[in-house]
Every structure is written in C-alpha cells, then in structure tokens.
C-alpha cells in the first residue's frame, strides 16, 4: 500500500489512510524535521550568497514536510503539538514572505502559510468549538501581512537576483 496522492486528499486524510507508513517516515526523518521546526524561532531568512545564476537555493522541502508531521501528531492524539506546530508553520511562512530575500523563498512562505492554515482549519473542524489554541497561534495570526509589502520585497529581491545574474554572465563573457 502506497501513500495516497496528495492532490485528492487532505493531509489528515492521507495520514489516516496509512498511519504506520507515516510513523516510519517521520521517525526516519526526525532529526531533519526537528532542525526545520527549530527554524521557526528565527525572525527572518536572508541568503548569504550573492545574487547570480549559479546561486544555490536552500533545501526548503523539510519545511513543507512539517505539515505532515503535525497531521500525524493530530491523528495520533497529540492535539496540542499538532495545533502548535501548524501555527508555528504559519508564522514561519509569514516570515519567509516578509523577508523578501527571493521570489522562490516568498513562494515557499506562501505555500507554508496555505498548507499549515488549511491543516489547522481541518483540525479545528474536528475539535470542540471551545478548543483553546496554543500560544504560537497568537503570533501566527496577530496581524495580517500587508500583501503589497511581501510582494514588493519579493519582487525587489528577484530584481536584484536577475541583475546580479546578468552581471555575472557579462563578466564571464568579457573575461573569455
């Protein structure tokens, strides 16, 4: 039995369909997931690399896999950890958007906000209406992110990347 296709099922449905499979997957990747979750403590992300065509991109995938871990926590009965993790994921995504370091980083941030907020809504739909939210949720949803601010920062960063990339290629052509 394989994993259900991501497009047709919610994260909770996918985890419920194969809880033991996900338990093993999460156990094998626990250290990487813990490191990714620890990044939520940082208030920004800036790439240390110059903007060029050959600039390496961070491995964003572990950040997106935290949604699966939080869904597994919920399915396994650890509601507090699941809710806290989803709210931390929303905040982490918002910070990536606000950093404006690169267009791809902002897009990953938007995906994190969407995935974590969707999971949070799915979990809350199954819980009593008076369910208390963890403290992480206050910061995650404290104030709306001005769309213009996030988009402007991302586009400025993309402009810097494109300009730097072209300059690096011109430098290579002139040197040859």
Predicted regions span which residues?
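Short acidic linear motifs
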Residues: 1-176
